[in-house]
C-alpha cells in the first residue's frame, strides 16, 4: 500500500457500502452465486446473528451486518458493473433474486437489469457499452447509490462534509437532479432524486479518511446528527458515526492497525466481556 493510502485497510477504498439487513448468511450465499463474491471475513454474535462480514467482488469490497439494538435494517441500492449484465442477471435470478426489470439498453450507454435479493437490497446490474470497458471511467465493480428527496441539498452536504467533487449531474427541466455522481477520495458515489417506485432509501457507507475526527466534525457542522463520537476501536481503526438529514449512515474511519482475523476475534471477545 502506498504512503497516501495508509488510512485505508488493504484491499479497501475510500468508500465501501455497508448493507444492514436480515439474513446476512443468506445474502452472502446470494452474492457468491450471483456475482462471484469471495468471503473475506465473518463474525457472529452470541445469538448467532452476524455482527460483521465482508466480501470482495472483483475490485470492490462490501460489508454487511444484521440489525441489532439501535442499528436498524437499511437495505440498500447498489450499482454493479460486470462484463456481461445479461449473464449476471440470470445468475442473480437463479440464486433467488426477484426481477425489478430485465436487462435492456439504456440511453446513458449501459445495458442494465435490476434484481432484488432475498434480504431486500436492490442490485442494478450493468455493462457499460460506450468506452470499450465494462465500467465507465472512474467506476469500480461496486458503486453505492443514494436515493433521496432533495438530491441537490444532499450534493451540497457531501461537498461540505466529505469534500466530494461532482463529476456528473443530470437535471430535469425543473432543475431536479435525476442522477448525479460524486467522487469522494478514490471512490464514486451515485445520487438521485427519489420518484415513483424508486422511493427514498437510506443506506450505510464506511468512509475511510486520513483524519476521522476532522471529517466527523465537518459532517456534524454540515448538518449531520451524531450516532457515535470518534474513538479507537478494538478492530484497529479510529471511527465515529453520523447520520445525515436523509437518514443515511456514515461510518467515518481512519485505519490504524492491520490485524489478523484471530486477533480481531480475540479483541472482540475481550470487548464483549468488558462491556458486560
How should each PLM-predicted stretch be described?
Residues 63-65, 114, 124, 190-192, ...:
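Conserved beta-strand in the GNAT
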Residues 8-11, 18-62, 145-188:
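Core segments of cupin and vicinal oxygen chelate
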Residues 70, 107-108, 128-132, 174, ...:
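A short acidic/small-residue loop/turn micro-motif
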Residues 15, 50, 110-112, 142, ...:
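Short loop/turn microsegments at loop-to-beta-strand junctions
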Residues 1-28, 40, 76-78, 124-156, ...:
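N-terminal beta-strand motif that seeds the catalytic metal site of vicinal oxygen chelate
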Residues 43, 67, 104-105, 194, ...:
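Short loop/turn motifs that cap or connect beta-strands within the blades
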Residues 6-9, 53-54, 68-70, 105, ...:
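Short secondary-structure boundary/capping segments
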Residues 23-25, 56-57, 61, 78-119, ...:
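Vicinal oxygen chelate
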Amino acid at each position: 500500500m502506498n504512503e497516501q493510502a495508509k488510512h485505508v485497510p488493504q484491499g479497501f477504498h475510500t468508500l465501501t457500502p455497508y448493507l444492514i439487513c436480515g439474513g446476512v448468511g443468506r445474502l452472502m450465499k446470494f452474492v457468491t452465486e450471483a456475482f462471484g463474491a469471495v468471503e473475506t471475513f465473518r463474525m457472529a454474535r452470541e445469538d448467532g446473528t452476524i455482527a460483521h462480514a465482508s466480501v470482495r467482488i472483483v475490485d470492490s469490497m462490501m460489508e454487511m451486518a444484521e440489525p441489532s439494538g439501535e442499528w436498524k435494517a437499511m437495505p440498500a441500492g447498489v450499482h454493479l458493473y460486470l462484463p456481461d449484465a445479461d449473464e449476471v442477471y440470470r445468475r442473480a435470478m437463479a440464486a433467488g433474486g426477484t426481477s425489478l426489470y430485465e436487462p435492456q439498453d439504456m440511453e446513458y450507454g449501459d445495458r442494465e437489469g435490476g434484481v432484488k435479493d432475498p434480504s431486500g437490497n436492490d442490485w442494478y446490474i450493468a455493462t457499460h457499452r460506450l468506452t470499450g470497458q465494462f465500467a465507465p471511467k472512474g467506476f469500480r465493480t461496486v458503486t453505492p447509490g443514494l436515493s433521496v428527496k432533495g438530491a441537490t441539498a444532499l450534493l451540497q452536504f457531501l461537498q461540505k462534509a466529505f469534500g466530494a467533487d461532482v463529476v456528473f449531474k443530470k437535471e430535469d427541466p425543473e432543475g431536479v437532479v435525476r442522477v448525479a455522481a460524486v467522487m469522494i477520495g478514490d471512490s464514486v458515489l451515485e445520487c438521485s432524486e427519489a420518484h415513483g417506485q424508486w422511493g427514498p432509501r437510506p443506506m450505510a457507507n464506511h468512509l475511510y479518511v486520513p483524519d476521522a475526527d476532522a471529517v466527523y466534525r465537518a459532517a456534524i457542522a454540515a448538518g449531520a446528527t451524531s450516532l457515535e463520537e470518534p474513538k479507537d476501536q478494538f478492530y484497529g481503526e479510529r471511527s465515529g458515526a453520523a447520520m445525515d438529514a436523509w437518514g443515511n449512515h456514515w461510518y467515518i474511519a481512519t485505519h490504524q492497525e492491520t490485524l489478523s482475523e484471530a486477533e480481531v476475534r480475540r479483541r472482540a471477545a475481550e470487548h464483549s466481556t468488558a462491556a458486560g
